[in-house]
Design a protein with these regions (language model features):
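Active-site-proximal alpha-helical
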Residues: 1-85, 97
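Beta/coil-rich, acidic/histidine-enriched accessory regions frequently appended to metallopeptidases
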Residues: 49-210
Length: 211
């Protein structure tokens, strides 16, 4: 889905714009996170390749946000070695080397900014208020039937994670129970012994779900 590729860019606007107020709609100088990102790009020389441009975006966003966004961009795949041909409004080459990734990581770390104190990768339009207030999770009850989970009366959950015995995520689901108090989601893979389910708050705190 081409629109899924836009999600990380919108999440940055949701958090830095809607949660932190860094948007032209709220700043008296009509600046903001994205306006400042665009201005930086406008006033600096273009990089030669798409891979360089993609990875430089990680540095620029961290610089403008005054936050270490390496974890966020790593989870979205920006800092993954790749060498492919992309057909999107025309055909082009996308190459990201490990050396370039290491360079960007070093430059971002050298900025000295703290990491966000939220699970930025899980913010959605529906959870903006959770990220503003950062309430703790209120546990409800949960049942499982095969690979389908039903969560009842859980509150302040940004997302649910299903992880395997190594801690690798095998399923992630939206945590909000709107408009009812019950949410149901189904994994694409079969449930296995050793799998665990966690409710994740806006701050990234995890609460184990028991059945």
């Amino acid at each position: 889905d081409v629109f899924c590729k836009l999600v990380p860019f919108w999440q940055l606007e949701l958090y830095f714009g809607k949660v932190l107020g860094r948007t032209p709609l709220q700043q008296s100088d009509k600046g903001g996170f994205y306006p400042d990102v665009y201005e930086y790009i406008r006033t600096h020389d273009n990089l030669r390749t798409a891979g360089e441009q993609q990875t430089e975006f990680v540095y620029i966003c961290s610089l403008i946000a005054k936050a270490n966004l390496l974890d966020f961009f790593t989870k979205w795949g920006f800092l993954t070695p790749v060498d492919i041909t992309v057909d999107d409004y025309g055909t082009g080459k996308l190459t990201v080397t490990q050396a370039r990734i290491d360079e960007i990581r070093s430059r971002v770390e050298a900025l000295g900014y703290p990491k966000p104190d939220v699970a930025l990768e899980y913010i959605t339009d529906n959870s903006v208020e959770l990220y503003k207030d950062k309430p703790g999770i209120v546990a409800g009850t949960a049942t499982r039937s095969g690979s389908t989970f039903t969560m009842t009366n859980w509150k302040n959950v940004a997302a649910y994670e299903v992880v395997d015995e190594t801690g690798k995520k095998v399923c992630i689901s939206d945590g909000l129970l709107v408009p009812s108090g019950t949410a149901t989601f189904t994994m694409k893979t079969a449930w296995k012994d050793g799998f665990k389910v966690y409710a994740v708050s806006a701050t990234g705190a995890r609460t184990a779900v028991t059945f």
